[in-house]
Swiss-Prot record:
It comes from the Bacteria. Gene3D superfamilies: N-terminal domain of the delta subunit of the F1F0-ATP synthase (1.10.520.20). HAMAP family: ATP_synth_delta_bact. F-type ATPases have 2 components, F(1) - the catalytic core - and F(0) - the membrane proton channel. F(1) has five subunits: alpha(3), beta(3), gamma(1), delta(1), epsilon(1). F(0) has three main subunits: a(1), b(2) and c(10-14). The alpha and beta chains form an alternating ring which encloses part of the gamma chain. F(1) is attached to F(0) by a central stalk formed by the gamma and epsilon chains, while a peripheral stalk is formed by the delta and b chains. GO terms for molecular function: proton-transporting ATP synthase activity, rotational mechanism. One of its GO terms (cellular component) is plasma membrane. It is a peripheral membrane protein. It comes from Brucella suis biovar 1 (strain 1330). F(1)F(0) ATP synthase produces ATP from ADP in the presence of a proton or sodium gradient. F-type ATPases consist of two structural domains, F(1) containing the extramembraneous catalytic core and F(0) containing the membrane proton channel, linked together by a central stalk and a peripheral stalk. During catalysis, ATP synthesis in the catalytic domain of F(1) is coupled via a rotary mechanism of the central stalk subunits to proton translocation. This protein is part of the stalk that links CF(0) to CF(1). It either transmits conformational changes from CF(0) to CF(1) or is implicated in proton conduction. Belongs to the ATPase delta chain family. This is ATP synthase subunit delta. The gene is atpH. Its main location: membrane.
Length: 186
């Protein structure tokens, strides 16, 4: 499993780096990041789309046509639309979530920011996001861009991943720790 994860990470880094260079040359890093965010939202909202990108059952031709149609329907054109088609043609759709995350990280580093992935049990308000950014900026010493994901299974609290650091204040983790402590006592 670690080898597969490493392979995906390597593929994701290479593709994200190439896309970033193209976006930088075209002076469109912000619009590419926005289009990737829209595609990521489609991906997180559709079980069928996730199956399309991860299943080896679909031929590269089927994936190419489907991704092209989805990108066109979502208004994702230009550099990102073409990029998605190339990724589909090369049968690397399975790496798209990693590519998107790697692109965000490269873009943030280019802007002198650090990126943090935040998992919350519910949607964060803009005020909560701003407060979290300010707190993380104090810890990192740099501007922080946050990517928020909602996962109701953590029950409450947050999980923040920033660089090599992870802060887990989720209720699920606290309950698991309490459960282990009670098992040790009894």
């Amino acid at each position: 499993m670690a080898e597969t994860s490493s392979l995906i990470s390597g593929v994701a880094q290479r593709y994200a780096g190439s896309l970033f260079e193209l976006a930088l040359d075209a002076n469109s890093v912000a619009s590419v990041e926005k289009d990737l965010g829209r595609f990521e939202a489609l991906l997180s909202g559709s079980k069928d789309l996730r199956r399309l990108i991860s299943s080896p059952v679909f031929s590269s031709e089927d994936q190419l046509h489907a991704i092209g149609a989805i990108a066109d329907k979502a208004g994702i054109k230009g550099l990102v639309g073409n990029f998605l088609r190339v990724v589909a043609q090369n049968r690397r759709l399975f790496a798209l979530p990693g590519i998107i995350a790697a692109f965000r990280q490269i873009a943030a580093e280019h802007r002198g920011e650090i990126s943090a992935d935040v998992v919350s049990a519910h949607e964060l308000t803009s005020a909560q996001q701003n407060e979290l950014k300010a707190t993380l900026k104090g810890v990192a010493g740099k501007d922080v861009t946050i990517n928020v994901t909602v996962d109701p299974s953590i029950l409450g609290g947050l999980i923040v991943k920033m660089g090599s650091r992870q802060i887990d204040t989720s209720l699920r983790t606290k309950l698991s720790s309490l459960k282990l402590a009670l098992k040790e006592v009894g």
